[in-house]
Amino acid sequence: MAMGTAVRRVRRWVARLAGVTALALLGTVLGAAGGLWANDAGTPRAEAVTRGGDALWMGHAWVDGRKSQADVAALAAQLRGTGIHDLFVHAGPLANDGRLDPALDPRAAWLVRALHRAIPGVRVQAWLGDVVDTPEGPGMDLSRVDLVPASEQVLADGFDGVHLDLEPVPSGDRGFLRVLAQVHALTSARGRVLSVSVPQTDPLPGLHEVAGLLTNHPKWWSSDYLHQVALRVDQVAVMAYDSALPLPSLFSGYVEQQTRLALAAVPPGVDLLIGLPAYTESTMSHHGSAETVAAAVRGVRLADSGRRLFGVALYVDFTATPEDWAAYREGWVR
Protein backbone atom coordinates (compact mmCIF):
# COMPACT_ATOMS: atom_id res chain seq x y z
CA MET A 1 0.00 0.00 0.00
CA ALA A 2 1.63 3.23 -1.16
CA MET A 3 0.77 5.77 1.53
CA GLY A 4 4.22 6.93 2.54
CA THR A 5 7.20 5.46 4.30
CA ALA A 6 5.63 5.40 7.74
CA VAL A 7 2.59 3.43 6.60
CA ARG A 8 4.78 0.96 4.71
CA ARG A 9 6.83 0.51 7.87
CA VAL A 10 3.67 -0.29 9.81
CA ARG A 11 2.75 -2.96 7.25
CA ARG A 12 6.29 -4.42 7.42
CA TRP A 13 6.06 -4.39 11.21
CA VAL A 14 2.80 -6.31 11.03
CA ALA A 15 4.37 -8.87 8.69
CA ARG A 16 7.39 -9.40 10.96
CA LEU A 17 5.22 -9.55 14.06
CA ALA A 18 3.06 -12.16 12.36
CA GLY A 19 5.94 -14.62 12.29
CA VAL A 20 5.59 -15.27 16.01
CA THR A 21 2.51 -13.49 17.26
CA ALA A 22 0.24 -14.81 14.52
CA LEU A 23 1.32 -18.34 15.34
CA ALA A 24 0.73 -17.68 19.03
CA LEU A 25 -2.71 -16.31 18.21
CA LEU A 26 -3.45 -19.17 15.86
CA GLY A 27 -2.47 -21.74 18.44
CA THR A 28 -4.43 -20.02 21.17
CA VAL A 29 -7.51 -19.38 19.12
CA LEU A 30 -7.58 -22.71 17.35
CA GLY A 31 -7.41 -24.28 20.78
CA ALA A 32 -10.67 -22.46 21.40
CA ALA A 33 -11.98 -22.96 17.87
CA GLY A 34 -15.16 -24.48 19.19
CA GLY A 35 -15.83 -21.23 21.00
CA LEU A 36 -15.31 -19.18 17.84
CA TRP A 37 -17.54 -21.46 15.82
CA ALA A 38 -20.14 -21.08 18.56
CA ASN A 39 -19.75 -17.30 18.30
CA ASP A 40 -20.49 -17.60 14.58
CA ALA A 41 -23.65 -19.61 15.18
CA GLY A 42 -27.11 -18.14 15.20
CA THR A 43 -28.94 -15.49 13.24
CA PRO A 44 -28.23 -11.76 13.55
CA ARG A 45 -31.07 -9.54 14.72
CA ALA A 46 -32.98 -7.85 11.91
CA GLU A 47 -32.24 -4.51 13.60
CA ALA A 48 -28.48 -5.10 13.38
CA VAL A 49 -27.91 -2.74 10.46
CA THR A 50 -26.23 0.59 9.81
CA ARG A 51 -27.21 3.63 11.86
CA GLY A 52 -25.67 5.91 9.27
CA GLY A 53 -22.43 6.34 11.20
CA ASP A 54 -20.02 4.17 9.21
CA ALA A 55 -16.58 5.18 7.93
CA LEU A 56 -14.09 4.67 5.11
CA TRP A 57 -10.30 4.91 5.29
CA MET A 58 -8.97 6.70 2.18
CA GLY A 59 -5.49 6.79 0.69
CA HIS A 60 -3.00 9.61 0.25
CA ALA A 61 -3.79 10.12 -3.44
CA TRP A 62 -6.75 12.27 -2.40
CA VAL A 63 -4.54 15.03 -0.98
CA ASP A 64 -1.33 14.92 -3.03
CA GLY A 65 -2.77 15.95 -6.41
CA ARG A 66 -3.55 12.59 -7.98
CA LYS A 67 -7.33 12.93 -7.57
CA SER A 68 -9.65 15.33 -9.38
CA GLN A 69 -13.20 16.66 -9.15
CA ALA A 70 -14.29 13.71 -11.29
CA ASP A 71 -12.94 11.35 -8.63
CA VAL A 72 -14.86 13.23 -5.95
CA ALA A 73 -18.05 12.90 -7.99
CA ALA A 74 -17.44 9.16 -8.47
CA LEU A 75 -16.87 8.72 -4.72
CA ALA A 76 -20.07 10.61 -3.94
CA ALA A 77 -21.99 8.30 -6.26
CA GLN A 78 -20.40 5.22 -4.68
CA LEU A 79 -21.32 6.34 -1.15
CA ARG A 80 -24.88 7.34 -2.03
CA GLY A 81 -27.35 5.14 -0.18
CA THR A 82 -24.74 3.73 2.21
CA GLY A 83 -24.29 4.46 5.90
CA ILE A 84 -20.88 6.09 5.54
CA HIS A 85 -20.60 9.37 7.45
CA ASP A 86 -16.85 9.64 8.23
CA LEU A 87 -14.00 9.72 5.74
CA PHE A 88 -10.50 9.16 7.17
CA VAL A 89 -8.26 10.75 4.53
CA HIS A 90 -4.55 9.94 4.82
CA ALA A 91 -2.87 13.33 5.23
CA GLY A 92 0.39 12.16 6.84
CA PRO A 93 2.61 10.43 7.56
CA LEU A 94 3.88 12.33 10.56
CA ALA A 95 7.58 12.71 11.16
CA ASN A 96 8.93 10.98 14.25
CA ASP A 97 9.04 14.34 16.03
CA GLY A 98 5.34 14.87 15.33
CA ARG A 99 5.65 17.38 12.52
CA LEU A 100 3.55 17.21 9.34
CA ASP A 101 5.30 18.36 6.18
CA PRO A 102 2.87 20.70 4.33
CA ALA A 103 4.28 19.42 1.03
CA LEU A 104 2.66 16.04 1.70
CA ASP A 105 -0.93 17.24 1.36
CA PRO A 106 -1.04 20.27 -0.97
CA ARG A 107 -4.63 19.54 -2.06
CA ALA A 108 -6.05 18.93 1.41
CA ALA A 109 -8.03 22.15 1.71
CA TRP A 110 -9.43 21.73 -1.81
CA LEU A 111 -10.44 18.15 -1.08
CA VAL A 112 -12.31 19.00 2.11
CA ARG A 113 -14.29 21.72 0.33
CA ALA A 114 -15.01 19.44 -2.63
CA LEU A 115 -16.21 16.58 -0.42
CA HIS A 116 -18.44 18.85 1.64
CA ARG A 117 -20.06 20.15 -1.55
CA ALA A 118 -20.47 16.72 -3.16
CA ILE A 119 -21.57 14.79 -0.04
CA PRO A 120 -23.61 17.06 2.25
CA GLY A 121 -23.26 16.11 5.90
CA VAL A 122 -20.11 14.04 5.45
CA ARG A 123 -17.41 14.40 8.12
CA VAL A 124 -13.89 14.52 6.67
CA GLN A 125 -11.11 13.67 9.09
CA ALA A 126 -7.34 13.90 8.61
CA TRP A 127 -5.77 10.47 9.07
CA LEU A 128 -2.37 11.03 10.71
CA GLY A 129 -0.05 8.16 11.52
CA ASP A 130 3.46 7.09 12.36
CA VAL A 131 5.42 4.13 13.66
CA VAL A 132 6.09 4.20 17.39
CA ASP A 133 9.53 3.44 18.84
CA THR A 134 10.19 -0.33 18.90
CA PRO A 135 13.26 -2.53 19.40
CA GLU A 136 13.29 -3.00 15.61
CA GLY A 137 13.80 0.65 14.80
CA PRO A 138 13.34 4.27 15.80
CA GLY A 139 9.94 5.88 15.67
CA MET A 140 7.77 8.33 17.52
CA ASP A 141 8.52 8.73 21.24
CA LEU A 142 5.05 8.95 22.78
CA SER A 143 6.46 10.11 26.10
CA ARG A 144 7.73 13.35 24.53
CA VAL A 145 6.05 14.03 21.18
CA ASP A 146 3.63 16.93 20.71
CA LEU A 147 0.98 16.36 18.03
CA VAL A 148 -0.93 19.58 18.69
CA PRO A 149 0.86 21.63 15.98
CA ALA A 150 0.22 18.99 13.29
CA SER A 151 -3.40 18.72 14.43
CA GLU A 152 -3.80 22.50 14.25
CA GLN A 153 -2.35 22.37 10.74
CA VAL A 154 -4.94 19.93 9.39
CA LEU A 155 -7.81 21.67 11.19
CA ALA A 156 -6.72 24.89 9.47
CA ASP A 157 -7.17 23.05 6.15
CA GLY A 158 -10.82 22.57 7.08
CA PHE A 159 -10.81 18.97 8.27
CA ASP A 160 -13.66 18.12 10.62
CA GLY A 161 -11.44 16.09 12.90
CA VAL A 162 -8.20 14.24 13.47
CA HIS A 163 -7.94 10.45 13.11
CA LEU A 164 -4.77 9.11 14.75
CA ASP A 165 -3.21 5.78 13.80
CA LEU A 166 -0.02 5.31 15.82
CA GLU A 167 1.36 1.77 15.87
CA PRO A 168 2.46 -0.28 17.74
CA VAL A 169 1.25 1.12 21.08
CA PRO A 170 1.64 -1.28 24.03
CA SER A 171 -1.29 -1.85 26.33
CA GLY A 172 -0.99 0.51 29.29
CA ASP A 173 1.23 3.08 27.56
CA ARG A 174 0.87 6.35 29.49
CA GLY A 175 2.50 8.46 26.80
CA PHE A 176 -0.25 7.60 24.33
CA LEU A 177 -2.90 8.68 26.83
CA ARG A 178 -1.04 11.98 27.26
CA VAL A 179 -0.94 12.56 23.50
CA LEU A 180 -4.66 11.84 23.16
CA ALA A 181 -5.56 14.19 26.01
CA GLN A 182 -3.55 17.02 24.45
CA VAL A 183 -5.03 16.63 20.97
CA HIS A 184 -8.55 16.14 22.36
CA ALA A 185 -8.30 19.43 24.24
CA LEU A 186 -7.56 21.13 20.90
CA THR A 187 -10.27 19.41 18.86
CA SER A 188 -12.89 19.98 21.55
CA ALA A 189 -12.03 23.67 21.74
CA ARG A 190 -12.40 23.93 17.95
CA GLY A 191 -15.67 21.99 17.82
CA ARG A 192 -14.02 19.14 15.92
CA VAL A 193 -13.59 15.44 16.74
CA LEU A 194 -10.71 13.19 17.73
CA SER A 195 -10.80 9.65 16.40
CA VAL A 196 -8.28 6.87 16.96
CA SER A 197 -7.47 3.48 15.44
CA VAL A 198 -6.93 0.82 18.08
CA PRO A 199 -5.75 -2.81 18.06
CA GLN A 200 -7.81 -5.76 19.15
CA THR A 201 -8.73 -6.59 22.75
CA ASP A 202 -7.35 -9.57 24.68
CA PRO A 203 -9.37 -12.64 23.61
CA LEU A 204 -8.15 -14.15 26.88
CA PRO A 205 -7.21 -12.14 29.99
CA GLY A 206 -3.55 -11.16 29.95
CA LEU A 207 -2.87 -12.41 26.42
CA HIS A 208 -1.27 -9.06 25.51
CA GLU A 209 1.39 -9.74 28.16
CA VAL A 210 2.18 -13.16 26.66
CA ALA A 211 2.52 -11.66 23.18
CA GLY A 212 4.78 -8.95 24.57
CA LEU A 213 7.08 -11.51 26.18
CA LEU A 214 7.25 -13.58 22.99
CA THR A 215 7.85 -10.78 20.51
CA ASN A 216 8.65 -7.48 22.27
CA HIS A 217 5.67 -6.16 20.28
CA PRO A 218 2.09 -5.50 21.34
CA LYS A 219 -0.73 -7.29 19.57
CA TRP A 220 -3.71 -6.78 21.88
CA TRP A 221 -4.80 -4.32 24.53
CA SER A 222 -6.47 -5.05 27.83
CA SER A 223 -10.13 -4.06 28.10
CA ASP A 224 -9.21 -1.56 30.80
CA TYR A 225 -6.66 0.19 28.59
CA LEU A 226 -9.12 0.37 25.70
CA HIS A 227 -11.56 1.99 28.13
CA GLN A 228 -8.92 4.52 29.22
CA VAL A 229 -8.18 5.41 25.59
CA ALA A 230 -11.87 5.75 24.75
CA LEU A 231 -12.36 8.23 27.60
CA ARG A 232 -9.94 10.59 25.85
CA VAL A 233 -11.44 10.58 22.35
CA ASP A 234 -14.75 10.98 20.50
CA GLN A 235 -14.46 7.95 18.25
CA VAL A 236 -12.72 4.55 18.38
CA ALA A 237 -12.08 2.38 15.31
CA VAL A 238 -11.06 -1.20 16.10
CA MET A 239 -8.69 -2.74 13.54
CA ALA A 240 -10.43 -6.12 13.72
CA TYR A 241 -8.38 -7.88 11.04
CA ASP A 242 -4.99 -9.60 10.56
CA SER A 243 -6.21 -12.37 12.86
CA ALA A 244 -4.22 -15.26 11.29
CA LEU A 245 -7.42 -17.30 11.18
CA PRO A 246 -7.77 -19.60 8.14
CA LEU A 247 -11.56 -19.96 7.78
CA PRO A 248 -14.36 -17.42 7.28
CA SER A 249 -16.41 -19.02 10.07
CA LEU A 250 -13.54 -18.68 12.55
CA PHE A 251 -12.87 -15.10 11.49
CA SER A 252 -16.55 -14.23 11.78
CA GLY A 253 -16.61 -15.72 15.28
CA TYR A 254 -13.47 -13.77 16.17
CA VAL A 255 -14.98 -10.49 14.95
CA GLU A 256 -18.11 -11.26 16.97
CA GLN A 257 -15.91 -11.70 20.04
CA GLN A 258 -13.89 -8.54 19.35
CA THR A 259 -17.08 -6.55 18.81
CA ARG A 260 -18.53 -7.74 22.12
CA LEU A 261 -15.32 -6.88 23.95
CA ALA A 262 -15.20 -3.41 22.40
CA LEU A 263 -18.86 -2.74 23.16
CA ALA A 264 -18.17 -3.57 26.80
CA ALA A 265 -15.02 -1.42 27.05
CA VAL A 266 -15.94 1.70 25.07
CA PRO A 267 -18.40 4.02 26.87
CA PRO A 268 -21.78 4.38 25.10
CA GLY A 269 -21.20 8.10 24.55
CA VAL A 270 -18.14 7.38 22.40
CA ASP A 271 -18.62 6.44 18.74
CA LEU A 272 -17.46 2.85 18.15
CA LEU A 273 -16.49 1.49 14.73
CA ILE A 274 -15.40 -2.04 13.83
CA GLY A 275 -12.91 -2.19 10.96
CA LEU A 276 -13.70 -4.37 7.94
CA PRO A 277 -10.82 -5.82 5.83
CA ALA A 278 -11.53 -4.57 2.31
CA TYR A 279 -8.18 -5.81 1.05
CA THR A 280 -6.67 -9.17 0.15
CA GLU A 281 -3.26 -10.40 1.24
CA SER A 282 -1.72 -13.81 1.80
CA THR A 283 0.49 -13.61 4.87
CA MET A 284 0.80 -15.49 8.13
CA SER A 285 -1.40 -12.89 9.80
CA HIS A 286 -3.97 -12.42 7.05
CA HIS A 287 -5.70 -15.07 4.95
CA GLY A 288 -7.64 -13.17 2.32
CA SER A 289 -9.96 -16.10 1.68
CA ALA A 290 -11.03 -16.06 5.34
CA GLU A 291 -10.88 -12.38 6.29
CA THR A 292 -13.62 -11.07 4.03
CA VAL A 293 -15.96 -8.13 4.41
CA ALA A 294 -18.91 -10.53 4.40
CA ALA A 295 -17.48 -12.62 7.26
CA ALA A 296 -16.61 -9.51 9.27
CA VAL A 297 -20.06 -7.99 8.79
CA ARG A 298 -21.67 -11.21 9.97
CA GLY A 299 -19.55 -11.14 13.13
CA VAL A 300 -20.43 -7.51 13.78
CA ARG A 301 -24.14 -8.16 13.33
CA LEU A 302 -24.10 -11.17 15.65
CA ALA A 303 -22.62 -9.02 18.43
CA ASP A 304 -24.60 -5.85 17.71
CA SER A 305 -26.43 -4.83 20.88
CA GLY A 306 -28.42 -1.99 19.36
CA ARG A 307 -26.11 0.75 20.60
CA ARG A 308 -26.75 4.07 18.85
CA LEU A 309 -23.15 5.25 18.30
CA PHE A 310 -21.99 2.13 16.49
CA GLY A 311 -20.92 1.26 12.98
CA VAL A 312 -18.30 -0.27 10.71
CA ALA A 313 -15.31 1.15 8.85
CA LEU A 314 -13.97 -0.18 5.55
CA TYR A 315 -10.19 -0.42 5.13
CA VAL A 316 -9.27 0.87 2.56
CA ASP A 317 -10.75 2.70 -0.45
CA PHE A 318 -8.06 1.89 -3.02
CA THR A 319 -8.11 -1.87 -2.41
CA ALA A 320 -11.86 -2.31 -1.90
CA THR A 321 -13.38 -4.35 -4.72
CA PRO A 322 -16.95 -4.27 -6.06
CA GLU A 323 -17.46 -7.51 -4.14
CA ASP A 324 -16.34 -5.80 -0.91
CA TRP A 325 -18.77 -2.95 -1.46
CA ALA A 326 -21.57 -5.38 -2.28
CA ALA A 327 -20.87 -7.36 0.91
CA TYR A 328 -21.02 -4.15 2.94
CA ARG A 329 -24.26 -3.00 1.30
CA GLU A 330 -26.02 -6.36 1.37
CA GLY A 331 -24.85 -7.36 4.82
CA TRP A 332 -24.95 -4.08 6.76
CA VAL A 333 -26.86 -1.43 4.81
CA ARG A 334 -29.57 -3.86 3.66
Predicted regions and their residues:
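Glycoside hydrolase catalytic-domain groove-lining segments
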Residues: 105-110, 188, 241-282
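Alpha-helical structural signal in soluble globular domains
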Residues: 111-118, 153, 182-190, 228, ...
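C-terminal region of N-terminal signal peptides and the immediate post-cleavage residues
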Residues: 26-50
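Substrate-binding cleft of secreted/luminal carbohydrate-active enzymes
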Residues: 31-39, 241-243, 265-334
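Short, well-ordered secondary-structure micro-motifs
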Residues: 137, 206-209, 248-249, 284-286, ...
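Chitinase-like catalytic core of GlcNAc-active glycosidases
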Residues: 46-73, 78-82, 86, 90-230
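Conserved, mostly hydrophobic/aromatic
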Residues: 87, 164, 236, 274, ...
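N-terminal Sec-pathway targeting helices
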Residues: 2-26
